[in-house]
Amino acid sequence: GAQDNSMADEKAIVKSGNMRFTVLTPEMIRIEYSAKLQFEDRASFVVINRHLPVPNFTQEERDGYLYLTTDKLELRYKLGTYPVSNDRCNPNLQITLDVNGVEEVWYPGKQDPYNLKGTTRTLDRAEGDVREWLENGLLSRVGWAVIDEREPRKDGSLSLMFERDTNGGMDWVAQRKDTAALDMYFMGYGHDYKKALGDFTKIAGKIPLPPLYVFGYWYSKFQRYTEQDMRDIVNEIRSRDIPMDVLVIDMDWHRNGKTGSTDGTEWTGWSWNKALFPDPAGFISWLHDEQNLNTTLNLHPADGVFPKEDNYDALYADLAGRYSDIKADSLTN
């Protein structure tokens, strides 16, 4: 797994004008472009480790091009140009690889109809085949895949950076130094999918196994339950000898985040609705200690945090110390 060292070995880095290439493995190259020459060495939401053993590679400038060649890939970059171009026959940047004896050429923006796909953020309103919702994944029958750290996800979210806390606290979310920069990882593993996934964990971190209980029986229903309702449900399930592992407490556990009311009219909220759950700590303790149940609170954070929340002042004070643009009326981003 990754060792959380976001700084690549200098021997793996090749700079050319506004471009920076990092040869991470024989099959993986990081590609950056920054008009401001502000390249990122901080960890991101996706990549936490770039300090890998430097693979064998050569670099050469010839006839106006930079060539980087590993045991598996040949990268060609037209010196002094923006890497994304409309000339598919002679792109400014291309990578060539062998896929089962067939030469495959990639360039920025090339579409991949053979990608084996990844995930989707939500299954809300899912009925039947939802493959068109899926984002591109790490594996493809075409033999290559790209992790584009600058491309917004389908829900509009971005991969941001982590600013290291030098005082022993928690690293904090930060914008990129150059918000217009390009930053992508080319993975040319052919059909060696196992190696592709293995090398991905070297840069992204080890994938933890879920605890066994999450594969058990969950009780979850979108209904305006009270604490007593949920105690009654647990007791009835137990009385029927139905094994249960997780109890989901749906969104009415919290107050209306904007107004502080307990009417259940607001999806976003962070403070317990004492009209329905008069003793939250006691209830959670009863679930954990007496019923041996795990629990989770259904949360919809999209609208942010408003001053009616119980701990708003403390949260605001902490964030205001980190960011100068925090507004006192709400924390919505």
PLM regions with names:
Residues 60-211, 221-222, 234-239:
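Catalytic and substrate-binding clefts that recognize carbohydrates or anionic sugar/phosphate headgroups
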Residues 30-31, 38-39, 146, 153-156, ...:
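Flexible loop/turn segments at secondary-structure boundaries
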Residues 25-63:
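A low-complexity, Ser/Thr/Gly/Pro-enriched, surface-exposed linker/loop concept
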Residues 2-8:
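Short, Gly/Pro- and small/polar-rich lid/capping loops
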Residues 208-333:
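Aromatic-lined carbohydrate-binding/catalytic grooves of carbohydrate-active enzymes
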